[in-house]
Amino acid sequence: MSASDASQANSGTDAAMPAASHAERRALLATCVAAAARGAEVVRAGAERRPTLEWESKGRFDFVSEVDRDSESALADVIAQRHPDATLLAEEGSPDAGTTRGLVFVADPLDGTTNFLHGVPWYAVTIAALVDGVLAAGATINVATGALFTATAGGGARHAGAPMRVSGITDPARSLIATGFPFSREEEIARYVPMLPAVMRATAGIRRAGAAALDLADVACGRYEAFWELRLSPWDLAAGLLLVREAGGLITTLDGAPCPVAETSCVAGSPVMHAWLLQTLVNGEP
């Protein structure tokens, strides 16, 4: 699929009509915000005792701490109180990742765990609500700064309560691009590294901050012109996907297909810069 085909395939909203009413989407957003805020409280408290925290490896360079688990438990309690019949799909302990029926919340209780463990103040709590597989609402909180990014399907995206839009910069030479490094699979590292030179030569810079949920939020609010990563989990992606779409951006896989709430590759940006980045990544040249 070409970049232009991708733009047509991903018009900025879910292909399906929202499965929830406007009032239901607003109520689900309120739950997302409350749950994310509760998780963020736990993470902030954990940051104060960071040097003594217990943490372990889930896989190659993939870490989890007691704070991840405590944050997930806290946000799960908020969801259970408000929506006792809902399913929670979260990073540290979740049911079948293929669950799409009914009301499903998808959450990362601490996106940017490695940053958190090293005292780098760039990590988030992020959560989205889906109704019968269709994104309805999402919220991401930058725990270190307190910045809140929210969106509802068809209702737009907001930052600190104000509407937000993707960047209007269309010249790659003036653009700032975000990315995430592959770290656990050798074949993905081999695929990723050749992508860098073409993007580096044509843009004002590349940033790798280590928290995809915040990268996508920053695309949605116009700080970055575009973002790409070879593999994201549904909890990394769900809220950010809705933020970018509702802020007027495009988000697809590296194949140019509409981005699912699943383990997938991701290319996101303003319509012009998404098309440019997708072409550059696929062809190796602007």
Can you say where each PLM-predicted feature lies in the sequence?
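N-terminal subdomain of lithium-sensitive/metallo-dependent phosphomonoesterases centered on the IMPase/IPPase/PAP
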Residues: 1-110, 286
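Residue-level signal for inorganic ion chemistry
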Residues: 43-46, 68, 79, 113, ...
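Generic detector of well-ordered alpha-helical packing
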Residues: 69, 73, 92, 109-112, ...
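A short, compositionally biased
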Residues: 50, 123, 151-155, 245, ...
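An extended, acidic
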Residues: 165-286
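Solvent-exposed alpha-helices and their adjacent loops that cap or buttress functional pockets
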Residues: 56, 97-99, 132, 150, ...
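DPxDG-like acidic metal-binding loop motif
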Residues: 99-158, 173
